[in-house]
């Protein structure tokens, strides 16, 4: 049985090419597979014979790139057990995308509007938090487990601890009080009305022990101050107030959060990994240093006039043993002294690797730390120029202590430098995601809604880290004023713009690259271009 077949001969200078129009009836009858190799045999000028080979069909698997929304959905699916029902999970998923794509104030109604639910019942969104239908610590556990999995290249776990104040205006919001304004000038102590939270973040390095890092929130704890009883009050009420006041101190709360993180690491199978916690000077005190759990190292700043001591000499006989030896020079005196030599250590800071000059004094003791041995690290300030021809300026020197004398100096310095990322977290959570803008007065909602925003911030950056590993990651073209460097990390604002573009591309059933044109050309002045895409997907906050 024969089938008419069209054959075209193309003669070239070095070869001849034959193009055969394969009959579809033959392909259907023979049940050919995609990728199967066949042979055409020319028997005469009027006849071609098709022969099938027995070669196995090997199809190349396409490398489908997972987008930011795919990774975000995958992570949020892991959080399903943290919700009281599937309906609560679905509602929270809508609020998540509404929070991350909202262009106005990040209130609950703003989340509902951004997710397309402005014409639906809004009370269910408020009840998610007021009736505690979301287990936020369990969501943080999912974030923590994924960060530890992605940061397995580190032989230890690096964490950052700090507190922040969320400004509020309502006097009836639970947990609000007058706080010291950290943004006030040095010569004047200003006060602001707001809530106080403690955040613990884990470092998610991009490339090993020396390189860029993100601080992913794994704990966002509300720390209200104790309410002073009014006069006249019974003595029992005053005694209870004093106990609540001690328990509400930030140093006490921070010590408890560190111990809680250490227990969580042990439960997740990381008992053998050391936990290195970077803190600022407000947590380098007796309350935190003397209550460190097993397997935990603290790296914190101290004053330049801190009084340190050497190890005591062993004395024979009975009696009380000495805990502190002779006085050592203060950190500032160590920096100025020539007896302790400078040594260079490489670490990542301010967008690139630097070589820092440091001085190290081991086996020092401090009365706030008790009998444990400490390591003092003095960091010489880096020089920088505001312009190419300007004079050299210097930053402030840093004085650090570490509770583990055997830890590598490079690890101590890098853990301290990575701690700055938690300050970036606070700024972006407040400015970009509107943490604390939700207008709620229920005690549960006032505590859980800011923590929900912090958890979404961690999920967003974790999804970005996983999506960036794909070679074909779909990303918006960067503006022209950005530096064309692959080492530059994606900002949180760019992540939100990419997420918004990917969601709108799915809704409009368009190709991702069709949204933004790098050049807009018009045939006449009357043809005005539309800048809606740039306005929506290149928002600058």
Question: Over which residues does each language-model region extend?
Answer:
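Single, function-defining residue in the core of a domain
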Residues: 61-80, 172, 209-541
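Long, compositionally biased stretches
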Residues: 1-14, 33-60, 356-366, 370-372
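Active-site-proximal, Lys/Arg-enriched surface segment
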Residues: 130-229, 361
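Gly/Ser/Thr-rich loops at beta-strand to alpha-helix junctions
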Residues: 102, 165-167, 280-285
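Gly/serine-rich nucleotide phosphate-binding loop at the start of the catalytic core
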Residues: 61-130, 136
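Structural motif
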Residues: 83-91, 187-193, 439-450
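Short hydrophobic beta-strand that contains or immediately precedes a catalytic carboxylate
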Residues: 21-22, 160-161, 278, 416
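Short beta-strand-centered segments at strand-helix junctions
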Residues: 17-31
